[in-house]
Each structure stands twice: as structure tokens, then as C-alpha cells.
């Protein structure tokens, strides 16, 4: 196997094993399944001769609909009481309240019954399929498809609710994050979610122990000059080999600058105001500019604050599709107009803007993780419970990696030159700053004098 962008492997693995139950869509699926059973009842009963099974299945669907409504109502109430300003709530240490575990236990029992009935119906249909007349085969296949969807849905629901039912005590060996979030902006409906916190055991079971050979490549596999973070996230075998290859591009053709700032990102209002005040002079004369933010709120505030003060057309992430936005940016440069892209984390990797398309990358602040990401918060909580420093073990290495990714948008060919400006003095004032600075490519540095 060869995995490009290998730094994403652990996250993609955890995404794959994340469980969820979205109460509105579950209710809709149950309702549609019940209607399908009613519509197909006579034909199905005549074909498979399972009258009692079909009636029992209809009853189970009714019970599941009620249980789904009950747990959704509980979740809506709990979010309203505990989520404060957010539409999301993570259960500390993954431990589920007693009332929700009771709901979960009831759901496990009835979903298991639905799974058993659906599997029996699937077997009955499959056994009779070969005996069916040719003109009935398409109908039987359609029935099988519907029943197999019921089986798959029940299996997914069972995994989620079993995870909740069993979450009475913290598990430091195989930790899980569990959380709720609103299913819609109006607060109606709840999404119940659960995810493993660590990918290493999953990757060992499903990849490292099975593959004869694996190659992982990425411009950002190492963080802070080592592969420790990668090993921690992925559980790579002890005999894995590591190699850092220098970029073919000359980092000396780029300048990495930190202005002499008066504000700190810890004071978001003052920091945003200083960015707005400095940006016109900062990018004056630059043709193509890419500005990257860690916060959508700050990005939107800066867009509003600099409107009408720049010579550049401002292209904001999500105002157009990503491909169209990049196309518009290139058109601006090709036609002699200045252009400024403002984007979030997804614009910090995988974007190629060589030459004049990007001669200045502006980074609003050090790209630390969003602290309310449930899985990352659960990981930090786990490390703290083990007496370790989550900030230094997770946040700083990840920020260093993301800063390298963001800075890497500047030099895309051997001829490229330009400037990277980080609007964050913490790289110079905090104890972790030197380690992050030393992990950057060998740019020419333009830093304010100490003191």
C-alpha cells in the first residue's frame, strides 16, 4: 500500500470508525420502512410465507420509532441545559449519564430484535429467489435490497447504542469520545456520536498486521523535527523506517516575517483590529495573496473590516466553490488585477498557486486545533488523566505541522519567491515558539528585535 498525504491517515481511520445516530433521519427511515412493509405485505407474505414475521417486524418498527423519539427528546433537553453557547456537548471521559444509558439499553434490545427479524426475512427471500419465476426476479431483488438496507441500518444503530449503554466507567486503555450535537439550527433533533480516540490499535489490526509493506508519504509527516507525533497517532510498527527528504525548492527564496505586533491572539478583538489596520500596508504591491485563518469568525470580521480599503479583489472561502474561487483568482492575476484569497484550514494544503498567483502568504495566527473538537478534546483529557501535558504533546506539534503546511503554499516551483507573514507574536514570546521556529524550512527570517 502507498498512502500519499499520510499525515491524514490516523484521522481518516477514526472517521471511518465513528458511529452516529441522527434522530430525524432515523425517524424518517423507520417511517418509510413501515410504509414499505404495509405496501408490500401481501406480496411478501405470499412469496415467503412469513406472515408472523412481517407482523412482528411492523410492531418492532413502531417500538423503535417511539424509542427514537424518546431519546431525541432527552437529548434536546440535555443540550439545552448543558451545551451553553454551543450546539454540541461532549461527555467527559466518554461516560454516559444513567438516564441516557437506560435509553441506550432499551434501544439495543429492540434494534437487536429488528436485526434478527430482518436477517431472517433476508434469508427467506434469498432462499426463494432461485425458485422464483423469471418475471419475479427483479421484484425479489428489489425486496432484498430494501431488507439488506434494514440490516445495515440496524447494525450501525446497534454499534452506537451498545457503545453508549456500556459507557459507565472511563476506559483509559481503549478510550472513546462520545458527544451530542443538534441535528439542525432550530434545535430539533439530535445526533448521538461516538468515536475511538486513538487510531493506533485500529491501524494495527486492520493495516500494519496484514500488509506486507506500506509506504506513507507527505510533506508534513514530521512535526518539530521528529516523527514522534506520527508514531503516537498511528502506532507504526517498531521496525518502521523513517526518512526526511529536503524540498527541491530553495527555502531561501522565501522570507518568513513576524511584524512587531502590539496585540496577542489571546485578545481576539484587539488582534483582529490590528490585522484590519495593518493589512492594507502589509500586502500593498503584492499581486496574489493567500490569507489563512484558524477562525471563521475572525475571517469574517477581517473581510468586513478591510472592505473598501484594498486594491485587491477579496475572494472568501465558501463564497464560490473552491475550484471556481481559485479559477477566479488566477483570472484576476492573468488580467493584471490584484487578488486576495481568504480561507480556513482546508486552504492550507493541497492548493497550488505558483508564481504571481501567490507571492505572499499571510497567516492570521498559529494554527492551533479548535479546542472544542470532541475527539481532540477527549484525547487531551486522556493525556491529562495520565499525568501528561496535552498542550505540549498534541497542540504544539500539530500547530507546528499546520504552520509548515500553510507556509508551504508559497514556494510551489523552483522559480517561486515571496513572503510569508505570521500575525502572531507568540512564536517569539512563548516557550514553545523556538521549537516551532526551528521546525520550519530554512527561510530568510524577518523578525522584530528582542525586547
Regions found by a protein language model. Name each.
Residues 1-451:
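ASCE RecA-like P-loop NTPase motor cores
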Amino acid at each position: 500500500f502507498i498512502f500519499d498525504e499520510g499525515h491524514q491517515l490516523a484521522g481518516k481511520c477514526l472517521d471511518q470508525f465513528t458511529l452516529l445516530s441522527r434522530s430525524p433521519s432515523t425517524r424518517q427511515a423507520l417511517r418509510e420502512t413501515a410504509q414499505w412493509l404495509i405496501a408490500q405485505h401481501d406480496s411478501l407474505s405470499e412469496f415467503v410465507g412469513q406472515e408472523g414475521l412481517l407482523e412482528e417486524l411492523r410492531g418492532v418498527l413502531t417500538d423503535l420509532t417511539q424509542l427514537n423519539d424518546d431519546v431525541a427528546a432527552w437529548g434536546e433537553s440535555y443540550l439545552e441545559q448543558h451545551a451553553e453557547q454551543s450546539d454540541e456537548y461532549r461527555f467527559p471521559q466518554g461516560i454516559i449519564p444513567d438516564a441516557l444509558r437506560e435509553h441506550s439499553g432499551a434501544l439495543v434490545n429492540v434494534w437487536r430484535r429488528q436485526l434478527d427479524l430482518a436477517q431472517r426475512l433476508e434469508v427467506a427471500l434469498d432462499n426463494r429467489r432461485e425458485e422464483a419465476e423469471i418475471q419475479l426476479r427483479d421484484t425479489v431483488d428489489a425486496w432484498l435490497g430494501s431488507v439488506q438496507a434494514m440490516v445495515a441500518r440496524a447494525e450501525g444503530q446497534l454499534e452506537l447504542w451498545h457503545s453508549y449503554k456500556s459507557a459507565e466507567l472511563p476506559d483509559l486503555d481503549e478510550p472513546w469520545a462520545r458527544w451530542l450535537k443538534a441535528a439542525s439550527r432550530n434545535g430539533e433533533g439530535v445526533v448521538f456520536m461516538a468515536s475511538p480516540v486513538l487510531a493506533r490499535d485500529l491501524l494495527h489490526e486492520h493495516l500494519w498486521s496484514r500488509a506486507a509493506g506500506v509506504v506513507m508519504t507527505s510533506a508534513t509527516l514530521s512535526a518539530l523535527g521528529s516523527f514522534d507525533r506520527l508514531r503516537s497517532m498511528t502506532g507504526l510498527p517498531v521496525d518502521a523506517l523513517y526518512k526526511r527528504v529536503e524540498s527541491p525548492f530553495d527555502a531561501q527564496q522565501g522570507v518568513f516575517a513576524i511584524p512587531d505586533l502590539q496585540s496577542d491572539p489571546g485578545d481576539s478583538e484587539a488582534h483582529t483590529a490590528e490585522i484590519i489596520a495593518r493589512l492594507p500596508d502589509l500586502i500593498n504591491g503584492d499581486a496574489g495573496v493567500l490569507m489563512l485563518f484558524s477562525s471563521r469568525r475572525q475571517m469574517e470580521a477581517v473581510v468586513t473590516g478591510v472592505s473598501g480599503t484594498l486594491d485587491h479583489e477579496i475572494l472568501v472561502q465558501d463564497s464560490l466553490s473552491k475550484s471556481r474561487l481559485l479559477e477566479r483568482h488566477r483570472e484576476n492575476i492573468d488580467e493584471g488585477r490584484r487578488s486576495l484569497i481568504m480561507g480556513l484550514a482546508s486552504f492550507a494544503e493541497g492548493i497550488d498557486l505558483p508564481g504571481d498567483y501567490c507571492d505572499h502568504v499571510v497567516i492570521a495566527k498559529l494554527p492551533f486545533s479548535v479546542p472544542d473538537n470532541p475527539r481532540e478534546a477527549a484525547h487531551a483529557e486522556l493525556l491529562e488523566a495520565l499525568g501528561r501535558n496535552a498542550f505540549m504533546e498534541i497542540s504544539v506539534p500539530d500547530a507546528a505541522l499546520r504552520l509548515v503546511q500553510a507556509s508551504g503554499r508559497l514556494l510551489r516551483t523552483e522559480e517561486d519567491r515571496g513572503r510569508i507573514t505570521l500575525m502572531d507574536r507568540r512564536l517569539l514570546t512563548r516557550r514553545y515558539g523556538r521549537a516551532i521556529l526551528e521546525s520550519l524550512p530554512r527561510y530568510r527570517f524577518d523578525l522584530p528585535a528582542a525586547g
